[in-house]
Design a protein with these regions (language model features):
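NTP/phosphate- and nucleic-acid-binding module
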Residues: 1-211
Length: 211
């Protein structure tokens, strides 16, 4: 509207993103400034004919508000839910019965393999209980959590938990890198599909002014 137009601009356009609760968040703006600011600051350019002309300028962009948009679009009551592509930590490894022989070593080896494949991974070797760690990393929105304990190592498997659906699935340790990569790709796609579905379910087409 005229009241929302950037002061001094000829026209202002905005991009409104729909959040999880159906509310909108202004995620980007584009202002056509015409020659108003160029005249004020004496901004000129040389035309093809050789003369000086006053420039037509714009101002546009997105900002840190997109971080808020991501949180509000995907987050839930448990905390953050980051899409894997932008997650600071894509995968966290939580040792189970960490003091048992070979557990930490197996977790460190898995971490090294995942890092070698370009996956952003953290090994939580703190003294907190597994339950505490689960809640903490869920709150931080890490897309995939790997639980690895003595029984898992003996069986040659690992338990992977998705942050977006909280679903748990067993995967073979032998193909850990490929399995985690595939799971991250699935989480990324499913989160995008879910966000689009929520958006589309709230779109109403108005063909006339009635009602």
């Amino acid at each position: 509207t005229e009241k929302e137009r950037f002061a001094g601009a000829v026209a202002t356009y905005t991009m409104e993103a729909m959040m999880r609760d159906g509310k909108s968040l202004q995620s980007g703006t584009s202002h056509y400034l015409g020659q108003n600011f160029a005249k004020a600051f004496n901004i000129e350019y040389q035309s093809n004919e050789g003369g000086l002309q006053t420039a037509y300028t714009t101002s546009f962009g997105v900002s840190t508000r997109l971080i808020g948009a991501i949180i509000m679009t995907h987050g839930d009551e448990r905390g953050l839910v980051f899409p894997p592509v932008i997650a600071p930590t894509q995968c966290v490894i939580v040792p189970i019965a960490a003091r048992k022989a070979g557990v930490i070593e197996a977790c460190e080896a898995l971490k090294k393999d995942l890092e070698g494949a370009g996956i952003r991974v953290t090994l939580d070797s703190t003294d907190n209980s597994p339950g505490w760690k689960f809640n903490e990393w869920e709150m931080k929105g890490v897309p995939v959590r790997i639980e690895l304990g003595p029984r898992d190592i003996e069986a040659g498997k690992m338990l992977c938990a998705r942050r977006d659906t909280l679903e748990k699935v067993e995967m073979p340790l032998e193909n850990a890198v490929e399995s985690v990569k595939a799971l991250l790709a699935t989480v990324q796609k499913d989160m995008l599909d879910a966000a689009r579905k929520r958006r589309d379910s709230r779109i109403v087409y108005a063909d006339d002014m009635a009602g």
